[in-house]
Amino acid sequence: MKVRASVKKICDKCKIIKRKGVVRVICDTPKHSQRQG
């Protein structure tokens, strides 16, 4: 999980979702998981 100011899709499997007002990227590759903060 990376915490970044701007979250972007890295690969085709990445999905951008909003959970409790927090923008997240979830992916099969753990390295690609991101959270905005």
From Swiss-Prot:
GO terms for biological process: translation. The keyword Ribosomal protein applies. Keywords: Ribonucleoprotein, Ribosomal protein. One of its GO terms (cellular component) is cytoplasm. One of its GO terms (molecular function) is structural constituent of ribosome. Signal peptide: none annotated. InterPro entries: Ribosomal_bL36, Ribosomal_bL36_sp. Belongs to the bacterial ribosomal protein bL36 family. This is Large ribosomal subunit protein bL36. It comes from Trichlorobacter lovleyi (strain ATCC BAA-1151 / DSM 17278 / SZ) (Geobacter lovleyi).
